[in-house]
């Protein structure tokens, strides 16, 4: 999507705020003893309160308001009976629509403290990779520079990127052009970012793996070697003044 009017911009900001509010409220509630279904109910209540609709349910008939992935799950984890424990690596991915406009956001974090420092490291480096990618976001620059920055950040920290999970265009649908915002450099991709373009940028940083495979059900993804993986995702509007993150709530 290319934002052309202030009405479109305000609509994107509104759904971005709602998704961010859901994400942050769910993260705050992720404590040992809670189930992923209970966390998902928080999203349901907040979506209803704000007049928004879960995109996974609306677009994909996904069996949950949000995707909650724990430890071996990398993405698209189904909320259910799974109980959260101290030291778990959790990813919460929230996407929704309101009045025909979408936002998509996600965060990975460690619950409490873990005796496995690599869990926290992949989370920290995912954040660093996203921040470095944002330095490349401006009209007229190559889309592939985002992936180059993400991959470089991973390598500098002796980590890897997941190559078959990518960002994407977003705005008037959950997935639209560009179809992929890679987490590595693709020299064949000559796509240029445009003023007002809306994209979801989501680095997936891993301890060892470079690809995910189907997991225990038709939705969840895992790595074959059970590597830890962390993701950070925001909906980003390309502007001449730099990236505008609709899913970031200012402190």
From Swiss-Prot:
Coiled coil: none annotated. Substrate binds at residues 76, 175. This is Methionine aminopeptidase. Its EC number is 3.4.11.18. A divalent metal cation 2 binds at residues 104, 168, 202, 233. Keywords: Aminopeptidase, Hydrolase, Metal-binding, Protease. It is an enzyme of class 3 (hydrolase). One of its GO terms (molecular function) is metal ion binding. One of its GO terms (biological process) is proteolysis. It catalyses: Release of N-terminal amino acids, preferentially methionine, from peptides and arylamides. It comes from Staphylococcus epidermidis (strain ATCC 35984 / DSM 28319 / BCRC 17069 / CCUG 31568 / BM 3577 / RP62A). Its cofactor is Co(2+); Zn(2+); Mn(2+); Fe(2+). CDD domains: MetAP1. Removes the N-terminal methionine from nascent proteins. The N-terminal methionine is often cleaved when the second residue in the primary sequence is small and uncharged (Met-Ala-, Cys, Gly, Pro, Ser, Thr, or Val). Requires deformylation of the N(alpha)-formylated initiator methionine before it can be hydrolyzed. Monomer. Pfam families: Peptidase_M24. The keyword Hydrolase applies. The keyword S-adenosyl-L-methionine does not apply. The gene is map.
């Amino acid at each position: 999507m290319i934002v052309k009017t202030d009405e479109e911009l305000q609509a994107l900001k509104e759904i971005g705020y709602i998704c961010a509010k859901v994400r942050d409220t769910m993260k705050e509630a992720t404590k040992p003893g809670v189930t992923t279904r209970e966390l998902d109910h928080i999203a349901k209540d907040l979506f209803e309160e704000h007049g928004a609709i879960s995109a996974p349910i609306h677009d994909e008939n996904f069996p949950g308001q949000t995707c909650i992935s724990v430890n071996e799950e990398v993405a698209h984890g189904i909320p259910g009976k799974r109980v959260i424990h101290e030291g778990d690596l959790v990813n919460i991915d929230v996407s929704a629509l309101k009045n025909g406009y979408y936002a998509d956001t996600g965060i990975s974090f460690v619950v409490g403290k873990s005796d496995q420092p690599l869990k926290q490291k992949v989370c920290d480096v995912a954040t660093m990779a996203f921040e470095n990618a944002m330095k490349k976001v401006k009209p007229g620059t190559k889309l592939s520079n985002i992936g180059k920055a993400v991959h470089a950040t991973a390598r500098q920290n002796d980590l890897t990127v997941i190559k078959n999970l990518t960002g994407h265009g977003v705005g008037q649908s959950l997935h639209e052009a560009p179809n992929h915002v890679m987490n590595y450099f693709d020299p064949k991709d000559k796509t240029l970012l445009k003023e007002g373009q809306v994209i979801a940028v989501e680095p997936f940083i891993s301890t060892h793996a470079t690809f995910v495979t189907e997991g225990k059900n038709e939705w969840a993804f895992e790595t074959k070697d059970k590597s830890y993986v962390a993701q950070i995702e925001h909906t980003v509007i390309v502007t001449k003044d730099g990236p505008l993150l609709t899913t970031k709530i200012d402190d």
